Structures are given as C-alpha cells and as structure tokens.
Amino acid sequence: GDACGETCFTGICFTAGCSCNPWPTCTRN
C-alpha cells in the first residue's frame, strides 16, 4: 500500500486508514 508518512515503532498508526505494516512503517489499508 501507499506510505502514510508516519512511523509506528509502538505498533500503532494514528493516521486514519493506516496500519503498521510492515513495521515500523504505516501504510494505507
């Protein structure tokens, strides 16, 4: 998916519609 411009070292993405995969990068669901 597309990058969300957010990292998720805690395993949580705060950007709506994004998931922490592959860690530690948030990508669009």
UniProtKB/Swiss-Prot annotation:
Disulphide-bridged cysteine pairs: C4-C18, C8-C20, C13-C26
InterPro entries tied to this protein: Cyclotide, Cyclotide_sf
Origin: domain of life: Eukaryota
Hydrolase found in the keyword field: no
Tissue: Expressed in leaf, fruit, pedical and stem but not in root (at protein level).
Post-translational modification: This is a cyclic peptide.
Cross-link Cyclopeptide (Gly-Asn), sequence positions: G1-N29
GO biological process: defense response
Record's keyword terms, sorted: Disulfide bond, Knottin, Plant defense
Function in brief: Probably participates in a plant defense mechanism.
Family to which this protein belongs: Belongs to the cyclotide family. Moebius subfamily.
Notes on the domains: The presence of a 'disulfide through disulfide knot' structurally defines this protein as a knottin.
Name the UniProt record assigns to this protein: Chassatide C1
Organism whose genome encodes this protein: Chassalia chartacea
Taxon lineage: Eukaryota, Viridiplantae, Streptophyta, Embryophyta, Tracheophyta
